[in-house]
Each structure stands twice: as C-alpha cells, then as structure tokens.
C-alpha cells in the first residue's frame, strides 16, 4: 500500500530547548495590541496563516528592526514608510521550542540558511506546519535579515492565545527609523 498525500509524516528529529524568562522583541503598527493578529491571519516564514497562526519575535531590538526593514525592502518601500511603530519588549517562557537556530540544525530537516525574501518561505512553512501539528510551542531559527547574529522565534497560537509570551509593560513608540540599525538595501 502506498502512502497518499494525507499519510502521516515521520516526526521531525529536532532538539527541544526551553526558554525561561528570556527577553524578546516585537514591532507592530501603532495602535495594535501586543498579540493582535489580523483576519485572515497572515503567512510567515514558518507557517501559512490558514494552517497555523504565529507571533514572530526577535532576539534583540536590532534584529527586530532589521526584519522590519527587510519586509519593507521586499515591498519596495523606503524605511521611513514603515513608521511610526511600537516596539514591545516581552518575556518568553516556553518549555518545548524546536531549535533550528544553526545551519547544521536546519540542514538536519532539509532546510538551508534563510534568505531575506518571501520566495524562500515554502520549505520553511512545510517544516513549521509539521512542528505545529506535532505540538511544538515555537520554532527558534536564524533571522533572515541578520543570519550571522540574529535569531527569530515563531510562537504558535494555541487556544486563542500565545501562552508563555507576555509584554511586561507598554510599548515604546518609535517615530522614525533608528539610526543605530542600517536598513537593508
């Protein structure tokens, strides 16, 4: 008997890590709540919005801005078009995170290093959606905008929320592109 398109996939061989009270960053349009998700939910590097909803976080302010500039550049918009923004500092505590944060870990599941473009997403989406189906809380990977020094975290929504992720205070409003982070050209 041959396996059909709906045949169960073998579980992915990935290492699990725990994040305990780690600081992560998220930028969003001014006026949105921290974990606001548009309807319909958007696609991201690690998922199609129709399959799984994810909240994307960055390991530093610099990585958050680099990812924002990457998205603007891909749409052909200058950096100033993406402001003002809110920058949220949040605390993340998750017990079961799939660690795909190195080239070696990505290769183990058939992925190459991420490139800063949407056309690179489909193989990552297949892996992310399988991890979601397997019950993982999140995927940790290299930032496509800063692969050598930045990390991104895609936290999957469960039960209409993002357990283990909380903003401890109000966001900081940023009215213009930060000078300390160079936009991607």
Where are these regions (language model features)?
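Active-site and NAD+-binding cores of ADP-ribose-processing enzymes
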Residues: 1-40, 46-48, 71-185
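Extended catalytic/binding region for NAD+/ADP-ribose chemistry, centered on the ART fold
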Residues: 45-75
């Amino acid at each position: 008997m041959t396996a059909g398109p709906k045949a169960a996939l073998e579980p992915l061989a990935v290492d699990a890590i725990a994040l305990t009270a780690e600081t992560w960053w998220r930028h969003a349009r001014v006026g949105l709540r921290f974990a606001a998700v548009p309807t319909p939910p958007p696609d991201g590097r690690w998922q199609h919005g129709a399959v799984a909803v994810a909240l994307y976080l960055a390991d530093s302010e610099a990585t958050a801005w680099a990812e924002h500039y990457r998205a603007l550049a891909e749409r052909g918009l200058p950096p100033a078009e993406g402001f003002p923004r809110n920058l949220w500092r949040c605390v993340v505590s998750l017990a079961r995170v799939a660690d795909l944060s190195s080239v070696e870990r990505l290769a183990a599941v058939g992925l190459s290093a991420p490139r800063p473009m949407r056309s690179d997403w489909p193989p990552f989406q297949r892996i992310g959606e399988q991890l979601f189906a397997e019950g993982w809380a999140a995927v940790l990977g290299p930032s496509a905008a800063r692969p050598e020094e930045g990390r991104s975290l895609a936290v999957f929504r469960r039960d209409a929320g993002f357990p283990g992720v909380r903003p401890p205070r109000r966001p900081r409003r940023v009215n213009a592109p930060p000078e300390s982070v160079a936009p991607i050209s």
